[in-house]
Amino acid sequence: MSRSGAAAEKADSRQRPQMKVNEYKENQNIAYVSLRPAQTTVLIKTAKVYLAPFSLSNYQLDQLMCPKSLSEKNSNNEVACKKTKIKKTCRRIIPPKMKNTSSKAESTLQNSSSAVHTESNKLQPKRTADAMNLSVDVESSQDGDSDEDTTPSLDFSGLSPYERKRLKNISENADFFASLQLSESAARLREMIEKRQPPKSKRKKPKRENGIGCRRSMRLLKVDPSGVSLPAAPTPPTLVADETPLLPPGPLEMTSENQEDNNERFKGFLHTWAGMSKPSSKNTEKGLSSIKSYKANLNGMVISEDTVYKVTTGPIFSMALHPSETRTLVAVGAKFGQVGLCDLTQQPKEDGVYVFHPHSQPVSCLYFSPANPAHILSLSYDGTLRCGDFSRAIFEEVYRNERSSFSSFDFLAEDASTLIVGHWDGNMSLVDRRTPGTSYEKLTSSSMGKIRTVHVHPVHRQYFITAGLRDTHIYDARRLNSRRSQPLISLTEHTKSIASAYFSPLTGNRVVTTCADCNLRIFDSSCISSKIPLLTTIRHNTFTGRWLTRFQAMWDPKQEDCVIVGSMAHPRRVEIFHETGKRVHSFGGEYLVSVCSINAMHPTRYILAGGNSSGKIHVFMNEKSC
């Protein structure tokens, strides 16, 4: 009997059509997925049920009816008896859109619904032993107030106890969050905060009182420790725009600053200088001495305490020795426009020093006139060139240009009638003393930005050499024009600024230059052509710094193949080099304790005078000449 019943049931199951719910596709829009399962006739033996995800955010929680049987204890034996009750509960019509549901509850319910679908898909294929043939009945119920509003329902009778309990928990959680009314409470709290917040107003900065805002010292408050105000400081004198005004034009009286003008000693001094108006008749163009005899004479030159003189108050910028054979007279030009004269034969030695003030700025160049040794010509930065005449006791003005600053000059003619003057701005002036007035005959500009020294060739006096920033140029005075004069030759071997450039005193066959690159250079100027070759470069420290006068290497007028230059070496010394670069002699001693930047040698006698930056002169001479 049982076999026949089983066979009949098996045949009946083959003929009866089976139902299968459409599978959920992930690319469908969840918000518009219908809860009504589509009916599909499948000729298979088993039926599979898939749950489509749904959202409770569009429905009101008070109208959502969950099955009460989920709260009871479920088991596999109770599925059949409670099937009808679950159907009726889940087939109710759910009203549309639930309002005022928090976003947090929505996301929780959506995630839970999606999880149910995923877990059911995983569990149902594996439980083949417990699979049941479920008949899915789809019913439509209509609301009395609407004609077409229908809501699909699902049959949850085939769910496991775990799934039904899980749906119950989801529903209870949704009810709980809805009962809290979090969104409404948040809205009310937000309104309360906005109402309580006072209006924002810009804070006004308090005005500072006129009193002292910060702590200050008694020195700044100008009070003493007892609190008494200190007396007001005296008003400093107003500085004049030009601290060194130019001296008035015209001749200046020769007035000594350190000696009385009316005493007999000063008159005797002027008479002594005026008596030297005749130039020396001794031939200075005799042949050169041998180096051996020259060294012997240099070794006999000594310095003593009696031959150190304090002449001026400022640094010495220029120096000249009078060519007298009987008296030793030294002239110096100082920084503050002073011209000092020193007679070494006068005793005591303080009585032989006379200081005059013919200029207002540094005296950079000083020469005794070759035609009249009683005349001394001085040139200054203040743009004046004066001639001191001791026979008349005046400083006569030779050339004046208040718009320019002079740097150096030399005599173009042997009778000292014409002069060439170099300017700091690179211009050159040709001055004729025979022309009335204090102006120039010709003014020309050079290709140099600055001129420091000017020196005339001793034989071919139409040529003169200038030293400037980087180059040394040789010009022809006959070719100077009013616009810009081009040099005949340029010595371009120098790498830094040049302090001086001088022809050799007798023949002019050599040129010595002093450069800031710590080199002395000697050139062969025996043939003034397109190029003058470099003969010798002597390494010598010429870095004097800011407070010392720059070195200027000069030829010995008696021995034109030897150069005299100051030295920065210790102990202090004055050195003489041969044109080949060999050191010939070094002057020194216990009374030479400073750097002698400016040096001059007597044209015929073995007398050397060196000036330092404190206004002192140091004289080396033979004991016979003392």
Swiss-Prot record:
GO terms for molecular function: DNA binding; enzyme binding. Residues 99-123 have a biased composition (Polar residues). SUPFAM superfamilies: WD40 repeat-like (SSF50978). Residues 140-150 have a biased composition (Acidic residues). Transmembrane segments: none annotated. The keyword Transcription regulation does not apply. Pfam families: WD40. WD repeats lie at residues 311-352, 358-400, 402-441, 446-485, 493-533, 535-565, 590-626. Residues 1-21, 95-159 are annotated as: Disordered. One of its GO terms (cellular component) is site of DNA damage. One of its GO terms (biological process) is regulation of DNA damage checkpoint. Keywords: Repeat, WD repeat. It comes from the Eukaryota. The keyword Iron does not apply. Specifically binds 5-hydroxymethylcytosine (5hmC), suggesting that it acts as a specific reader of 5hmC. Belongs to the WD repeat DDB2/WDR76 family. Interacts with CUL4A and/or CUL4B. This is WD repeat-containing protein 76. It comes from Homo sapiens. The lineage of its organism: Eukaryota, Metazoa, Chordata, Craniata, Vertebrata. The gene is WDR76.
